[in-house]
Amino acid sequence: MEKMHITNQEHDAFVKSHPNGDLLQLTKWAETKKLTGWYARRIAVGRDGEIQGVAQLLFKKVPKLPYTLCYISRGFVVDYSNKEALNALLDSAKEIAKAEKAYAIKIDPDVEVDKGTDALQNLKALGFKHKGFKEGLSKDYIQPRMTMITPIDKNDDELLNSYERRNRSKVRLALKRGTTVERSDREGLKTFAELMKITGERDGFLTRDISYFENIYDALHEDGDAELFLVKLDPKENIAKVNQELNELHAEIAKWQQKMETSEKQAKKAQNMINDAQNKIAKNEDLKRDLEALEKEHPEGIYLSGALLMFAGSKSYYLYGASSNEFRDFLPNHHMQYTMMKYAREHGATTYDFGGTDNDPDKDSEHYGLWAFKKVWGTYLSEKIGEFDYVLNQPLYQLIEQVKPRLTKAKIKISRKLKRK
């Protein structure tokens, strides 16, 4: 086994074709991290000119100290049963990490627990410290240890039928409601950033500046690994649909009124059907007024939701999503998710990753909403083997990885107690 000097294109091709490859190991992903102070180095090992393992090493300086952290996000990309390749990757990583004054090498492979026996044993044998099997969104990890994944290598009907029944009905309703899902371009990021700001204010989290999303799009779109989707509501088109539905409802009422006059047996049923139709008419009249007001203000329509869809070979990722507070009954997110899954499948993906979650959290957990949303899309829980540290500077590692988190947790507890008072 020997070190190899390969191009960025060769590195990315290996990552995209390997079962343990991941978006975060693509060379263009490293470019997106520069804004937050990370820089990258890359290593590769192989035999007789054939690549057998690669890794992208991210480095970030420790504040006020002449040291760095070496972080191999979702790496190494290697067959973990191949001890020789794994050992060679670690040797190469140590050499570079020491030159960059790293206090530790941190990895979190894209290897699931049920397939990770070799990885666990071999990494521990090499001296890696395993950080345990904690909850998926534990703050002790950089990347979530658990994500929710939908298999999408199936036809449209099979994909839709893989969703939970209630969610399946919502998707079908969303398809009828009259929104349009667009694959947008860089200009659309302005709209997406505005939607993200609205989402953050509604759900209580800090949002990124537009430059952050431009950075991701610019780095990965050229290779087809980043796409922006937006969902638009056209008022004129939907006013026509509402008018058609109103006409149908009035016709239905007339039909049941006629039956009431000709059949006493059907009178009760007919009255119920008439009442139901009248309720629908009232709702549609309200909707029509809202759409007419929208048409006056925004005759070209408005965008209701958006998302960034990412790729790494046969894996696709729902990375960021945002939505408006208006016209939520049109279920734009449901239309968008189904459309993005189909697009991902048509462009070579077999899986669609919704991102991090805990495993069936309690209803009072802050993470329950995420779990509840992600579990209805025909997903399975992808539980990774977790995070590992290879310590290069024990005193500094002890200070940064163990003492500092304890102090932070203590400050949080004190702050919460003071707030209660």
Swiss-Prot record:
Q: What is its EC number?
A: 2.3.2.16
Localization recorded for this chain is:
Cytoplasm
Listed A to Z, the keywords are: Acyltransferase, Cell shape, Cell wall biogenesis/degradation, Cytoplasm, Peptidoglycan synthesis, Transferase
User: Coiled coil where?
Assistant: none
Under the heading SUPFAM superfamilies, the entry gives:
Acyl-CoA N-acyltransferases (Nat) (SSF55729)
> Some GO term, biological process aspect, for this entry: which one?
peptidoglycan biosynthetic process
Q: Which reaction does it catalyse?
A: beta-D-GlcNAc-(1->4)-Mur2Ac(oyl-L-Ala-D-isoglutaminyl-L-Lys-D-Ala-D-Ala)-di-trans,octa-cis-undecaprenyl diphosphate + glycyl-tRNA(Gly) = beta-D-GlcNAc-(1->4)-Mur2Ac(oyl-L-Ala-D-isoglutaminyl-L-Lys-(N(6)-Gly)-D-Ala-D-Ala)-di-trans,octa-cis-undecaprenyl diphosphate + tRNA(Gly) + H(+)
Gene Ontology terms: cellular component: cytoplasm
Principal location listed in the UniProt entry: cytoplasm
Q: Which cysteines are joined by disulfide bonds?
A: none
Q: Which GO terms describe its molecular function?
A: aminoacyltransferase activity
- Entry function: Catalyzes the incorporation of the first glycine of the pentaglycine interpeptide bridge, which is characteristic of the S.aureus peptidoglycan. This glycine is added to the epsilon-amino group of the L-lysine of the membrane-bound lipid II intermediate (GlcNAc-(beta-1,4)-N-acetylmuramic acid(-L-Ala-D-iGln-L-Lys-D-Ala-D-Ala)-pyrophosphoryl-undecaprenol), using glycyl-tRNA(Gly) as donor, in a ribosome-independent mechanism.
Relate the assembly described in the record. Monomer.
Family membership noted in the UniProt record: Belongs to the FemABX family.
Q: What is this protein called?
A: Lipid II:glycine glycyltransferase
Upper lineage is:
Bacteria, Bacillati, Bacillota, Bacilli, Bacillales
